[in-house]
Amino acid sequence: MANYYDSNKATVAKSKGFMLGNQEQHFPSEGLYLGDLTGGSITLPALYDLNSGKGLCFLYNNEHSQRQANACLERLACRIALTVPSHLCDLVIYNGGDPSNAFMVHSRMNKHIMGNRNERIFFDGNLDAFRELLNEAYASVIERMSNIRLAGKRDLVELNESLGNDARLKYQFFILADFPGFMNMDAINRLTQIVEAGSKAGVFVLMSFDMRANIVDAYSSAPFNPQRLLSNMQVLVPQGNSFSFRNSGHDEVINRFNYVPGAPD
């Protein structure tokens, strides 16, 4: 299939280009656009399926792959804000890097995009507030999963589809740039717990991870092992100027193509 969009409707969530005024009001179950997969004369979109039950993590090991990963995260945040209905969307953005790096500043996420969503941006000075929010999100995951099982549903998306508009629960999106910047082990462990079960409960974590970071548990002096966190995420690993996929369920097929993250509009 030479051109995916010849036979598939280009939506805000999955299309390569989109107009900020063209907002759609639905859960983006068709996937979020990450960039293009290219191989020979074939070009296909790389899509992240929010409903896969896994989070999404870009690994990076230098400034170039960091810029690529964070630019794609910005674009994903915009697509989420443009697609998920405002009364069902709680968008939390955490900047673990230098506050001067302008990742997802308020001026970039303008009111036309955000509408009345609960946009909350945290830097290192607000880590206590962010950690409290992680605790609230984890408690919410436990409660939601109980309600989902009682209703005999697979996940929150399926549960919400069976409820009236006023009864539907919000989807919560955590966008984390430059993890683990400024986060202590308590916050990291809580985030890991959220990633393990959060997607099915409508709590989604999309992040970039600085592989150069030295994370040590202050209690045991042992280094942090990221395997528990990353095993529950679709992971994109830097390979020169591109990235390869891990833990997507289709790694062997996808990695026959060259993938470069989509640049911001």
Locations of regions flagged by a protein language model:
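Conserved glycine-bearing catalytic or ligand-binding loops at nucleotide- and phosphate-handling centers
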Residues: 265
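Long, low-complexity segments enriched in small/aliphatic residues
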Residues: 2-25
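P-loop NTPase catalytic phosphate-binding loop
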Residues: 17-154, 161-261
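Long, charged, glycine-rich C-terminal linkers/tails
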Residues: 2-4, 154-157
